[in-house]
């Protein structure tokens, strides 16, 4: 969601309506770009309607791992620069370790750092398969 999509009851209702109209019975993961969604009330409401929060690594956003509805989805945009970032191996390992320590049925790490995606993806793949 764009950073202009702030936590309000109207926006929560919009998400609920969208999920119902789209007939999405399964879990839905939404990436919020405004920190107003990261509070106990909104998290409880999202979990109640079976919408999970996408955890993100990006500039100016909280680096929190969300586990809603037994699902962790972590998107790596770039720690210091959106999309144009090459993660150091120790950064990826730290994120992998944090995700691994969490209990969830579904765990996923998605690279969205266009310029560093290939070497970072190779590192992730090698360490996940080993």
Positions of PLM-derived features:
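Residues lining hydrophobic/aromatic ligand-binding pockets adjacent to catalytic sites
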Residues: 1-130
């Amino acid at each position: 969601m764009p950073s202009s999509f702030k936590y309000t009851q109207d926006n929560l209702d919009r998400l609920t309506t969208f999920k119902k109209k789209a007939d999405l019975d399964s879990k839905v993961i939404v990436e919020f770009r405004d920190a107003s969604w990261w509070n106990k009330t909104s998290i409880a409401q999202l979990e109640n309607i079976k919408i999970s929060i996408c955890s993100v690594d990006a500039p100016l956003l909280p680096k929190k791992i969300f586990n809603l509805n037994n699902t962790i989805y972590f998107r790596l945009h770039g720690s210091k620069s959106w999309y144009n970032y090459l993660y150091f191996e120790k950064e990826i390992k730290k994120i992998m370790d944090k995700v691994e320590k969490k209990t969830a049925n579904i765990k996923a790490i998605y690279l969205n750092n266009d310029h560093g995606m290939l070497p970072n993806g190779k590192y992730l793949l090698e360490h996940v398969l080993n």
